Amino acid sequence: MAVQGSQRRLLGSLNSTPTAIPQLGLAANQTGARCLEVSIPDGLFLSLGLVSLVENMLVVATIAKNRNLHSPMYCFICCLALSDLLVSGSNVLETAVILLLEAGALVARAAVLQQVDNVIDVITCSSMLSSLCFLGAIAVDRYISIFYALRYHSIVTLPRARRAIAAIWVASVLFSTLFIAYCDHTAVLLCLVVFFLAVLVLMAVLYVHMLARACQHAQGIARLHKRQRPVHQGFGLKGAVTLTILLGIFFLCWGPFFLHLTLIVLCPEHPTCGCIFKNFNLFLALIICNAIIDPLIYAFHSQELRRTLKEVLTCSW
């Protein structure tokens, strides 16, 4: 699996510039002595990937086991876990192949390695795109459940959810394949960045609107009990903290990766950008960390899911 310098290869040429743009392999005198490069050992990549792999496998198995969890909301959560599982699994596979090649335990022809690398790139890219899509889908689902509560079950039906899920997977595979094929075009990188920003804005708008509605509801209840300010302010503060954590984790884990893509287009040869490019492995590790955090935010808060998880762990099928 191709490694450029100290950086692993992901999504074809993402850790290098497209052929139409000068390479990111900046000399030491270009990047300067002040560059901070965070080294991510292969062992850490494997550890993070395996933790995420096991965690998301448990989520998928738990939802599959309990028929009460086969609602549209849990279908989206299950698909998010599957996407995160593929992100982690592809990186575990790539890291394992790199280590085997470096140790001389695996010998393969360059053409074979190139094909394997392309397949892993497509899997990684499609799972990342689908993960972002399902994060947005979960936000939309929760928004409808709050603002259209009486009509929720007629709007978000299981057949519609399945069609949406199928469309997301097909679109993710299709666009990731096109991306790998045309990764030397800056327009492709810009499309990915715009897509990330669109998902971020969508989630922020929906969750902020949901928080505002929840605060209004709490304020109305407080007025009935003549305890307006303490209850309302306490609820609003708790909701704001929760929202900040949710969106903050999303931005901190995904933002650096898409900043990397943006800088490839804007300043491929600038020394400061070159310093940022050196930390590609760190950005990838943050995405894997997000795959570890997602189940804690979206899945394990459910008592029904936690109860079923205990059954899965005790093998009581």
Swiss-Prot record:
One of the record's GO molecular function terms: melanocyte-stimulating hormone receptor activity
Ranges per topology, Cytoplasmic: 64-72, 141-163, 212-240, 301-317
Keyword GTP-binding among UniProt keywords: no
Main location per the UniProt record: membrane
Covalently lipidated residues, kind S-palmitoyl cysteine: 315
PROSITE patterns from the UniProt entry: G_PROTEIN_RECEP_F1_1 (PS00237), G_PROTEIN_RECEP_F1_2 (PS50262)
Keyword Thylakoid recorded: no
Highest taxon, organism lineage: Eukaryota
GO terms for biological process, alphabetical: adenylate cyclase-activating G protein-coupled receptor signaling pathway; regulation of metabolic process
Membrane topology of this protein: Multi-pass membrane protein
Residues carrying sugar: 29
Keywords of this entry: Cell membrane, G-protein coupled receptor, Glycoprotein, Lipoprotein, Membrane, Palmitate, Receptor, Transducer, Transmembrane, Transmembrane helix
InterPro entries in alphabetical order: GPCR_Rhodpsn (IPR000276), GPCR_Rhodpsn_7TM (IPR017452), Melcrt_ACTH_rcpt (IPR001671), MSH_rcpt (IPR000761)
Localisation: Cell membrane
Function: Receptor for MSH (alpha, beta and gamma) and ACTH. The activity of this receptor is mediated by G proteins which activate adenylate cyclase. Mediates melanogenesis, the production of eumelanin (black/brown) and phaeomelanin (red/yellow), via regulation of cAMP signaling in melanocytes.
Listed name of the protein: Melanocyte-stimulating hormone receptor
Gene: MC1R
